[in-house]
Every structure is written in C-alpha cells, then in structure tokens.
C-alpha cells in the first residue's frame, strides 16, 4: 500500500479507485489549517477517508471538526440526535440500509461532505461500502458518457420503505416514513454533475431517483440499473469494517454508499454530521432545480441545505 507522509499525518491508500486511511490525526475543532488542508486534499483525491481510534470525539467535537470543512447543516426532515446537527444512524429502523445512495439528493444543494462516527458496533457485520461516482463515469464507454451527459432525473424522499426492510414492523416503518417525508421533496438534477472543486464529472443517481426525465418508468429503470451497475462494480468500491471510535468522511458529491444490514439484532449506532453543499451544475451549465415545495424549509435547528452557499 502506498503511504504519503507529511509532518505527522499519513495517508494510506486502501482501494484502487477509492478510499484511504489517515493516521497521525486526533480529530476535533482545534486542528491546524495545514492539517485540515491535508485532510481535505486526501478527501478530494480518495473520495472517502477513514480514521481509527477517535474514541475521544463526542457530539461537540464532531460538530466542531465539521465546521473546519464548511457549514454544518441539519437533515431537512429527520430530527437530530443532539438537538443540533448530529443525525442518529442506528439499527432500530435501518431505512437507509441495503441500498446505494448519495445523502439527501432530494434537495438541490445536498451536502458536500458527510462525517460518520461509530459509537456502538455489532460483533459481526454492519460494514459500509462506498463507490466512486467519478471513476464510474470516466470508465463508461464513450456512447454511455455522451448519453449520461444529456440526461436529467427527478429525486424524491418518497419511496417504498417496506421493500427496503420487509421484516420491519409496519408501525415502525409508518412512523419513520411519516418523519422522513414530513416535507415531500422533488428535485431535478443532471445525471452528470461537474464537481465544483476537482472539475471531474460524476454520476448523480442512487435510490432517491424517481425517474429519468423523458422516459417511461420501465425505460428509466433499465437505464438507471445500467449506470448503477458501473457505480457498484466491485473494483469501483471500498468496504470498511467498523470499530467503535472510527470516523469516515466522504465527498458526497463524488460517491454513493451502502450500509449492510447483516448484524441480526445486535445494536449498531453511529452519528452523522453533514457539511453544506452547493447546487449541482451539469455539463451543459444547467443547474439543479427544486420542483416542490417552493423552498427548502428551515430545519428545527440551523440553516436549510444550500443556505450557506447561497449567502
């Protein structure tokens, strides 16, 4: 494995197309500008970076570190775990498990970065996979790249929750759905966005996609599955086996991820803080647009997604 060392910080590549482990860093809000610059550079290069042994990190430190990467932003509909920005990811509902997705793409300016901290990890299973949507695009055959460049798709937070977790109690699914869709969003995105920092083209799809514009439901599904097969290809992914105290940070503009629900009844608890993003722009220069509601409402704490970028 290739290791790049600068000062006390090490960056060790762990996947051919995606993923690196960073050592020599104690995460928190007191990191030097130089260290934050190194972390951000590794994040843009490797798309997801991992830190072991961050057991000292609590809710305050988690959010303070997030502020070094940008403006933290709360989830548009789901209440936080701490009354501020940290979203609880746990084994009780598992509604986002067992599916490939990019966080919160049902709003126009979805998060730029997600920072996930492991609190309680089961004795087996519960891994997370990430896929590189930039290399998925660049490795497409040219005719498919040309096609993808021309497409737009509608993303929504309304989807079939029961199909994702068929063994869950109906009342638990109904309760989670009521919260998750307390505001029903529909946003039109380009299928290919131009990354605002790297200039790379990335595929913008995942399980929030309702339909590709201009196609029948069947044709849209077939085309989505075709593009997703390139995103999910094993050589385009990295898998992380969690330990308590681990932290993963990913570029949400250039990745999808998949939480594996395979740890039985064992508890799995993580906390996620997201950093505000900007409105995607396609290869033709056309930005994403919110279809409904008319505006993104302010969450119970903090700013609405995209508010810091628009300011």
Name what the model sees in each region.
Residues 2-247, 253-311:
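Non-heme Fe(II) oxygenase catalytic core, chiefly the N-lobe of the double-stranded beta-helix
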């Amino acid at each position: 494995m290739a290791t790049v060392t600068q000062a006390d910080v090490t960056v060790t590549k762990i996947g051919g197309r995606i993923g690196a482990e960073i050592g020599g860093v104690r995460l928190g809000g007191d990191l030097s500008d130089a260290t934050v610059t190194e972390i951000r550079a590794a994040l843009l290069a490797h798309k997801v970076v991992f830190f072991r042994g961050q057991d000292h990190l609590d809710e305050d430190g988690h959010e303070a570190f997030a502020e070094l990467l940008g403006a933290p932003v709360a989830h548009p509909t789901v209440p936080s775990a701490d009354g501020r920005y940290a979203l609880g990811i746990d084994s009780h509902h598992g509604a986002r498990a067992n599916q490939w997705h990019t966080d919160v793409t049902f709003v126009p300016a979805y998060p730029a970065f997600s920072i996930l901290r492991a609190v309680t990890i089961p004795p087996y299973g519960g891994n997370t996979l990430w896929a590189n949507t930039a290399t998925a695009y660049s490795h497409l055959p040219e005719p498919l790249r040309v096609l993808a460049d021309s497409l737009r798709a509608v993303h929504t937070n309304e989807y079939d929750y029961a199909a994702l977790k068929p063994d869950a109690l109906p009342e638990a699914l109904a309760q989670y759905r009521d919260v998750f869709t307390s505001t029903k969003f529909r946003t039109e995105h380009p299928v290919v966005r131009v990354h605002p920092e790297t200039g790379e083209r990335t595929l913008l799809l995942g399980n929030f996609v309702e339909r590709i514009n201009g196609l029948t439901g069947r044709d849209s599904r077939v085309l989505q599955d075709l593009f997703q097969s390139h995103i999910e290809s094993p050589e385009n992914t990295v898998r992380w086996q969690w330990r308590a105290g681990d932290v993963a940070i990913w570029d949400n503009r250039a990745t999808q991820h998949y939480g594996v629900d395979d740890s039985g009844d064992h508890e799995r608890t993580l906390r996620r803080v997201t950093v505000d993003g900007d409105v995607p722009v396609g290869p033709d220069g056309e930005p994403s647009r919110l279809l409904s509601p008319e505006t993104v409402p302010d969450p119970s704490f903090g700013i609405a997604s995209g508010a810091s970028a628009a300011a």
